[in-house]
Curated annotation (Swiss-Prot):
Organism: Hydrogenovibrio crunogenus (strain DSM 25203 / XCL-2)
GO molecular function, one term: ATP binding
Cellular component terms per the entry's GO annotation: cytoplasm
Cell compartments where the protein resides: Cytoplasm
Residues engaged in binding AMP: T31, R36, K57, L58, V59, G85, F86, P87, R88, Q92, R156, R167
Protein name per its UniProtKB record: Adenylate kinase
Purpose: Catalyzes the reversible transfer of the terminal phosphate group between ATP and AMP. Plays an important role in cellular energy homeostasis and in adenine nucleotide metabolism.
Record text about domains: Consists of three domains, a large central CORE domain and two small peripheral domains, NMPbind and LID, which undergo movements during catalysis. The LID domain closes over the site of phosphoryl transfer upon ATP binding. Assembling and dissambling the active center during each catalytic cycle provides an effective means to prevent ATP hydrolysis.
Protein family: Belongs to the adenylate kinase family.
Superkingdom, taxonomy of origin: Bacteria
Catalysed reaction, written as an equation: AMP + ATP = 2 ADP
Annotated gene: adk
Gene3D superfamilies for the chain: P-loop containing nucleotide triphosphate hydrolases (3.40.50.300)
Metabolic or biological pathway, per its Swiss-Prot or TrEMBL entry: Purine metabolism; AMP biosynthesis via salvage pathway; AMP from ADP: step 1/1
């Protein structure tokens, strides 16, 4: 199966990506990881990407599409793949289609903004170990202290409410239009499923909803 996962930052895409990659034995293809790997391996696409990044510019869609095409041609993508963080915009989705990359299902994890702010603003992290907590859903035994070490927990800058709201604004401007784009594509194309799941449900309920919709 070839998937695209859509949803705002904090909607739970990471959790569902882990589930889907395991369930279908497919790799999760993150554009960030691909870029880093291509630059490290000094592939032609990687060298081009590095030039843009060194100049402080965004890497072009053409380069990202080239990286995606190279990556999905690798043997571990024989059963399919899950695209993570791409496409982010309608022009990128058009470019992906024009490049002949076929997708079986687009899964949208739908969570209201207010819930996302609540989820992310409640996160606390133990910097040394990476252990994460949530003041409502997974609180530490002692407020603001790590369970194992008793060290202070911190709130990451990008989990602060005002930062989360800024990220949601960018998501609604750039990425949310993909929802309409892929819904329209699925109506025209019997091979493409568009699945919208209520991401406020418990994790295992979200997983079951996705699997039943894929049948």
């Amino acid at each position: 199966m070839k998937f695209i996962l859509l949803g705002a930052p904090g909607a739970g895409k990471g959790t569902q990506a882990q589930f889907l990659t395991k369930e279908f034995n497919i790799p999760q293809i993150s554009t960030g990881d691909m870029l880093r790997a291509a630059i490290k391996a000094q592939t032609p696409m990687g060298k081009m990407a590095k030039e843009f990044m060194d100049a402080g510019k965004l890497v072009t869609d053409e380069i990202i599409i080239g990286l995606v095409k190279d990556r999905i041609a690798e043997p571990d993508c024989a059963n399919g793949f899950l695209l993570d963080g791409f496409p982010r915009t309608v022009p990128q989705a058009d470019a992906l289609k024009a490049a002949g990359v076929e997708i079986d299902a687009v899964i949208e994890i739908d969570v209201p903004d207010s819930e996302i702010v609540n989820r992310m603003a409640g996160r606390r992290v133990h910097p040394a170990s990476g252990r994460t907590y949530h003041i409502t859903y997974n609180p530490p035994k002692v407020d603001d202290k790590d369970n194992e070490t008793g060290d202070d927990l911190i709130q990451r800058e990008d989990d602060k409410a005002e930062v989360v709201l800024d990220r949601l604004k960018v998501y609604h401007e750039q990425t949310a239009p993909l929802i309409g784009y892929y819904k329209a594509e699925a109506e025209k194309n019997d091979q493409l499923k568009y699945i919208q799941v209520d991401g406020t449900q418990p994790i295992d309920t979200v997983e079951k909803s996705i699997l039943s919709a894929l049948k």
